[in-house]
UniProtKB/Swiss-Prot annotation:
Belongs to the eukaryotic RPB7/RPC8 RNA polymerase subunit family. Component of the RNA polymerase IV complex. Interacts with NRPD1. It comes from the Eukaryota. GO terms for biological process: DNA-templated transcription initiation. The lineage of its organism: Eukaryota, Viridiplantae, Streptophyta, Embryophyta, Tracheophyta. DNA-dependent RNA polymerase catalyzes the transcription of DNA into RNA using the four ribonucleoside triphosphates as substrates. Component of RNA polymerase IV which mediates 24-nt short-interfering RNAs (siRNA) accumulation. Implicated in siRNA-directed heterochromatin formation through the action of DCL3 and AGO4, and subsequent DNA methylation-dependent silencing of targeted sequences. Essential component of a self-reinforcing loop coupling de novo DNA methylation to siRNA production. One of its GO terms (cellular component) is RNA polymerase IV complex. This is DNA-directed RNA polymerase IV subunit 7. Pfam families: SHS2_Rpb7-N. InterPro entries: NA-bd_OB-fold (IPR012340), RNA_pol_Rpb7-like_N_sf (IPR036898), Rpb7-like (IPR045113), Rpb7-like_N (IPR005576). It comes from Arabidopsis thaliana (Mouse-ear cress). The gene is NRPD7. Keywords: DNA-directed RNA polymerase, Nucleus, Transcription. It is found in: Nucleus.
């Protein structure tokens, strides 16, 4: 789910950038975009997608050690985070006999266990897949509608993993 958030952030402008004749607001926006792009995700907000509106620029404070100027800013941004029970679409990118891995938006690790695919059987081979009695296939590249069972934040990688299920109405490959 996409979430609109209001974020406080500290933007640091090197002293040499103040001499280039750039407008201050432009220099702050450029530094904000650079810092925002380096920050992948947070546990509370999910994946940081994009800043949208710069709402406020606070008073700058000079750092005595470096001479840089630090400005507190407040801006609106868009984040993406999956929640338990949410219905989401994803694309299969790995197939194993125990289940499949999907991608959806910035989520790269979504696991759909074979135990959460009722009626589907694993078909081994060069290009393995899962198939049900109606010949519906879950294979690499297949688009799947699933329900999120749970998510987990991975601090070291600064990303999320999710568990999925297609046990329910209107869920599965489409």
């Amino acid at each position: 789910m996409f979430i609109k958030v209001k974020l406080p952030w500290d933007v640091t402008i090197p002293a040499e950038d103040m001499d280039t004749g750039l407008m201050l607001q432009r220099a702050i926006v450029i530094r904000l975009l650079e810092a925002f792009s380096k920050e992948k995700a947070t546990k509370d907000l999910g994946y940081l997608i994009t800043p949208t509106i710069l709402e406020n620029i606070g008073e700058g404070k000079i750092k005595e050690q470096t001479g840089e100027i630090q400005f507190p800013v407040v801006f609106n941004g868009i984040c993406f985070k999956m929640f338990k029970g949410e219905i989401v679409h994803g694309v299969v990118h790995k197939v194993h006999k125990t289940g499949v891995f999907l991608k959806s938006g910035p989520y790269e690790i979504i696991y759909l266990s074979h135990m959460k695919m009722p009626g589907y059987e694993f078909i081994p081979g060069e290009n393995p897949f899962f198939m049900n009695q109606y010949m519906s296939r879950i294979q690499i590249g297949a688009r799947v509608r699933f329900v999120v069972l749970d998510t987990e934040w991975r601090e070291a990688e600064k990303d999320f993993m999710a568990l999925a299920s297609i046990d329910g109405d209107n869920l599965g490959p489409f």
